């Protein structure tokens, strides 16, 4: 592998696990992070020698852990999901919450925004998936064909021509949904443990899922078939496709594994030297991942409250 990922910087600002990270295609100089400290931070990526990123705004209002966050594609707004059962929409110019999405009866575990910035999907421990408009009106609650356990992850296809989203749950299922009719297209079974992460490739053709069983499963969204599986051999906390390489990155415990989808092999494993972690205490884990829009920088969120920034180098 001629290209490698090298640890470039760490971002300090949260006082709890960094549960989620998001970037926006139209603004490469910002990063959004959500945390168990109940806050969301908007980072300005200055990339100088002193600071790689500066905390520009801290968004507060949730009364429990922030479990997921998403930037709108135009980067004007942000969404956050929380264990306080709500989703919030934030105006990033003003730094204030403009709408609360109320309707879930248990912790909201995941949130995603459509490529046209107009629709929002959420998944919850109440076992439902809800589709909302951007100002917080619930348009539809999916129960028919839905999950029989916690809905851990929901993600829109980033391809605006592909009106689908996917969901994953603790019922070991991965489900593909039609956004126009809110109907179930396919249920994918194969995982032997709960599924905690699901993601769609940039062109909308592939879906990857992972979780407790340590297996990455690749699904063809056009043909509704299982393509192949990759063994991570560790609990998978988060997944993300590279925007410009045939790479799939998996947060697996205290490391990040990079798989090449052409060779179907692991090509890199990113690890951190944790100083002062005793033999009895476990190492911090990576639990969130996102790429910069140009695919040159991988951001990772950890349970030691840090964001670690990795750069692709030749």
From Swiss-Prot:
GO terms for molecular function: protein kinase C binding; protein-membrane adaptor activity; ribosomal small subunit binding; ribosome binding; signaling receptor activator activity; structural constituent of ribosome; translation activator activity. Its main location: cytoplasm. CDD domains: WD40 (cd00200). The keyword Hydrolase does not apply. One of its GO terms (cellular component) is cytosol. The modification Phosphoserine is found at residues 39, 148, 242, 255. The modification Phosphotyrosine is found at residue 52. WD repeats lie at residues 13-44, 61-91, 103-133, 146-178, 190-220, 231-260, 281-311. It is found in: Cytoplasm; Membrane. GO terms for biological process: GCN2-mediated signaling; negative regulation of cell integrity MAPK cascade; negative regulation of cytoplasmic translation; negative regulation of p38MAPK cascade; negative regulation of translational frameshifting; positive regulation of autophagy; positive regulation of conjugation with cellular fusion; regulation of actin cytoskeleton organization. Keywords: Cytoplasm, Membrane, Phosphoprotein, Repeat, Ribonucleoprotein, Ribosomal protein, WD repeat. The modification Phosphothreonine is found at residue 10. The keyword Membrane applies. Component of the small ribosomal subunit (SSU). Mature yeast ribosomes consist of a small (40S) and a large (60S) subunit. The 40S small subunit contains 1 molecule of ribosomal RNA (18S rRNA) and at least 33 different proteins. The large 60S subunit contains 3 rRNA molecules (25S, 5.8S and 5S rRNA) and at least 46 different proteins. RACK1 is located at the head of the SSU in the vicinity of the mRNA exit channel. RACK1 interacts with the mRNA-binding protein SCP16. RACK1 also exists simultaneously as a homodimer in a cytosolic non-ribosome-bound form. Interacts with pck2. Component of the ribosome, a large ribonucleoprotein complex responsible for the synthesis of proteins in the cell. The small ribosomal subunit (SSU) binds messenger RNAs (mRNAs) and translates the encoded message by selecting cognate aminoacyl-transfer RNA (tRNA) molecules. The large subunit (LSU) contains the ribosomal catalytic site termed the peptidyl transferase center (PTC), which catalyzes the formation of peptide bonds, thereby polymerizing the amino acids delivered by tRNAs into a polypeptide chain. Belongs to the WD repeat G protein beta family. Ribosomal protein RACK1 subfamily. This is Small ribosomal subunit protein RACK1.
